[in-house]
């Protein structure tokens, strides 16, 4: 087993920013068609609610084994502006981002900047195009039962309580408007009466079901008025119904959570949840999931939602682009972060240059030895200010530096509205003025500026606290990951790929030292390294001193990782240094058209599409890889080991100046 240094072989990458649109229909026309088709659903579902804040460009923390006031008018104005926001970036902003992305990446990070410097295999590296199309990267979640999630059933579970499809068309737009105003207590009416034109029991039943399903919290009754039949809607529980409308209309015999498989293309999990929330008119926090999935990929994962019927969810399949919902079931419990067993990846590397022998050696090494379990580049952000630098400033209690790192102008091109916001901040130090430059205020910069407007420049800690907790913790987790990557590289450089006395292994969740007399009982796959914290132990060899020196250089005390603000105290965790993927398989295929898909997705299979057939020879060659990884493990680091090169976008941009043309 040999360990090799980084080589300078080029990794080409496709146009990451440009979305594929193979339908032949202009994107805008398709969007209008979909929105028109779905306007009925958007206007009739439940409550109008604020959405939870979502932060852009902050990497999410992987799971590890753990050890242990400004003016009122200004704040009101800011909140009013937020209410006017829609799905995020305007089309103008999206175009601006696309045009400037390559320039922005030139000022980003390389792998060496974050401690990623070693390989475990000795094969010769080769190049390939990663994610030329987002459909070349498919992620299937592995559930807590060990099964790989697939979308293969769009049917709705049989339930006598479920209303028919007619509930979506039986009410007029005016009736829906009146019912929504009643539901939300927007006027003084205590009831709404709807005349039954076709007085049949079936028609009355559908109207009853439509009101109860589409306007949770309302009850109905039938009344005779002057010889005519009316369905009368009213609040059975007063304003309590508004607080939890689903509580008053959900059958007791049915599990409270509808579980479903979400298939999505080119959208991350939180963005997808926000879209579903908007169409259903509910808060995002009624959804639960076991893990977040990245944007530029096709991903399949299980989601649970509180007291939303499978029928309402299935109706969204008619409305949403790049989403598909299916495999519905009712369960008693939600899903919890970290419950998944891992993810299964199907990855296509196009236009590979490696010979069949090189590919064989690379994939055999991945299968038999594995790869260094580095935290991937997405852990550290994509701009000129890495997230670990912000995390380090938080741990140092340097709050002015935290504010400056997030808000100051930075080198390299950036989204146009952010450039204007940063320039305004640098010029005026006025958070309200800078915030006005942001059309999207739910990014980290917008949230911090809101906090500064509310709490003032002398209370940066409280202002920073406006950012959602998980996103704040991303910064310090990024710093921990930065330290871990550097220390693992040094551990492998000093001791190679065999366990040595003083290394750490886990027994359950507890770390213990490898002693001289039992070193032969372990392999490198058992060895773990700590993320720095107050509740971990460090290797009992010279890597312990390397940890101490690195933290001391950053003005941090390795013996005192508790912070005066409890949220930012680091307990630490342990992480395996080498990961061996499971279910590894691969094939090299020949193809001529770089735009054709090289395998079927779940949706392709549902639609009955024939799997692609490959000729024995073609203009290009591609490597199709399948493998499963445990949670918090980065597939890009496995791909890096196969190709033997720097996977950072900065390096790819510098070595491939035409990759975005």
Swiss-Prot record:
Residues 370-580 form the TRUD domain. It catalyses: a uridine in tRNA = a pseudouridine in tRNA; uridine(13) in tRNA = pseudouridine(13) in tRNA; a uridine in mRNA = a pseudouridine in mRNA. Its EC number is 5.4.99.-. GO terms for cellular component: nucleus. The keyword Flavoprotein does not apply. InterPro entries: PsdUridine_synth_cat_dom_sf, PsdUridine_synth_TruD, PsdUridine_synth_TruD_CS, PsdUridine_synth_TruD_insert, TruD_catalytic. Residues 1-97 are annotated as: Disordered. It is an enzyme of class 5 (isomerase). The active site is at 294 (nucleophile). One of its GO terms (molecular function) is RNA binding. Disulfide bonds: none annotated. Residues 36-52 have a biased composition (Polar residues). Interacts with SIRT1. It is linked to Intellectual developmental disorder with abnormal behavior, microcephaly, and short stature: An autosomal recessive disorder characterized by intellectual disability, developmental delay with poor or absent speech, short stature, progressive microcephaly, hyperactivity and aggressive behavior. Some patients manifest sensorineural hearing loss. Pseudouridylate synthase that catalyzes pseudouridylation of RNAs. Acts as a regulator of protein synthesis in embryonic stem cells by mediating pseudouridylation of RNA fragments derived from tRNAs (tRFs): pseudouridylated tRFs inhibit translation by targeting the translation initiation complex. Also catalyzes pseudouridylation of mRNAs: mediates pseudouridylation of mRNAs with the consensus sequence 5'-UGUAG-3'. Acts as a regulator of pre-mRNA splicing by mediating pseudouridylation of pre-mRNAs at locations associated with alternatively spliced regions. NCBIfam families: tRNA_TruD_broad (TIGR00094). Belongs to the pseudouridine synthase TruD family. This is Pseudouridylate synthase 7 homolog.
């Amino acid at each position: 087993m040999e360990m090799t240094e980084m080589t300078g072989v080029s990794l080409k990458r496709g146009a990451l920013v440009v979305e594929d649109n193979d339908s032949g229909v202009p994107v805008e026309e398709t969007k209008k068609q979909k929105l028109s088709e779905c306007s009925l659903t958007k206007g009739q579902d439940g409550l109008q609610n604020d959405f939870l804040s979502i932060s852009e460009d902050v990497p999410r923390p992987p799971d590890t084994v753990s050890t242990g006031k400004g003016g009122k008018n200004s704040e009101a104005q800011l909140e009013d502006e937020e209410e006017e926001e829609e799905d995020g970036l305007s089309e103008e902003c999206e175009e601006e981002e696309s045009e400037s992305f390559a320039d922005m990446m030139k000022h980003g990070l390389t792998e060496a900047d974050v401690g990623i410097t070693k390989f475990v295999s000795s094969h010769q590296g080769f190049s390939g195009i990663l994610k030329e199309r987002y459909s070349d990267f498919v992620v299937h979640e592995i559930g807590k039962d060990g099964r790989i999630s697939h979308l293969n059933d769009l049917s709705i579970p049989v339930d006598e309580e479920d209303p028919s499809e007619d509930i979506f068309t039986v009410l007029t737009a005016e009736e829906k408007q009146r019912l929504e105003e009643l539901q939300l207590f927007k006027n003084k009416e205590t009831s709404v009466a709807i005349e039954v034109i076709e007085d049949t029991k079936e028609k009355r039943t559908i109207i009853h079901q439509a009101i109860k399903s589409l306007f949770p919290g309302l009850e109905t009754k039938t009344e005779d008025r002057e010889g005519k039949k009316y369905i009368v809607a009213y609040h059975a529980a007063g304003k309590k119904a508004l607080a939890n409308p689903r509580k008053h209309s959900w059958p007791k015999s049915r599990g409270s959570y509808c579980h479903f498989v979400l298939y999505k293309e080119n959208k991350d999990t939180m963005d997808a949840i926000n879209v579903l929330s908007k169409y259903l008119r509910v808060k995002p926090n009624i959804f639960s999931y076991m893990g977040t999935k990245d944007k530029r990929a096709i991903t399949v994962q299980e989601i649970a939602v509180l007291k939303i019927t499978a029928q309402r969810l299935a109706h969204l399949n008619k409305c949403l682009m790049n989403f598909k919902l299916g495999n519905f079931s009712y369960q008693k419990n939600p899903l919890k972060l970290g419950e998944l067993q891992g993810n299964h990846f199907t990855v296509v590397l196009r236009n590979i240059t490696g010979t069949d022998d090189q590919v064989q050696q690379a994939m055999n090494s991945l299968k038999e030895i594995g790869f260094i379990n580095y935290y991937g580049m997405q852990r550290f952000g994509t701009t000129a200010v890495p997230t670990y630098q912000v995390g380090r400033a938080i741990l140092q209690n340097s709050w002015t530096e935290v504010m400056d790192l997030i808000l100051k102008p930075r080198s390299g091109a950036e989204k146009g509205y952010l450039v204007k916001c940063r320039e305004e901040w640098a010029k005026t130090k006025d958070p309200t003025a800078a915030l006005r430059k942001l059309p999207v205020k739910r990014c980290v910069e917008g949230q911090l500026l809101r906090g500064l407007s509310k709490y003032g420049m002398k209370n940066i800690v409280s202002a920073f606290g406006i950012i959602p907790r998980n996103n704040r913790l991303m910064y310090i987790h990024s710093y921990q990951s930065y330290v871990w990557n550097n220390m693992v590289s040094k551990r492998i450089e000093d001791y190679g790929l065999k366990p040595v006395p003083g290394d750490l292994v886990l027994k359950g969740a507890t770390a213990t030292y490898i002693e001289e007399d039992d070193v032969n009982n372990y392999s490198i796959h058992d060895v773990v390294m700590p993320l720095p914290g107050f509740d971990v132990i460090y290797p009992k060899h010279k890597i312990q001193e390397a940890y101490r020196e690195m933290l001391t250089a950053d003005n941090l005390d390795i013996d005192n990782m508790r912070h005066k603000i409890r949220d930012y105290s680091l307990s630490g965790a342990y992480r395996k240094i080498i990961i061996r993927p499971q279910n590894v398989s691969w094939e090299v295929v020949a193809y001529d058209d770089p735009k054709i898909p090289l395998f079927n997705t779940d949706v392709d299979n549902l639609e009955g599409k024939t799997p692609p057939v490959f000729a024995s020879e073609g203009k290009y060659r591609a490597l199709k890889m399948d493998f499963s990884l445990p949670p918090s493990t980065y597939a890009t680091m496995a791909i890096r080991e196969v190709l033997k090169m720097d996977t950072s976008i900065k390096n790819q941009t510098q070595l491939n100046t035409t990759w975005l043309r």
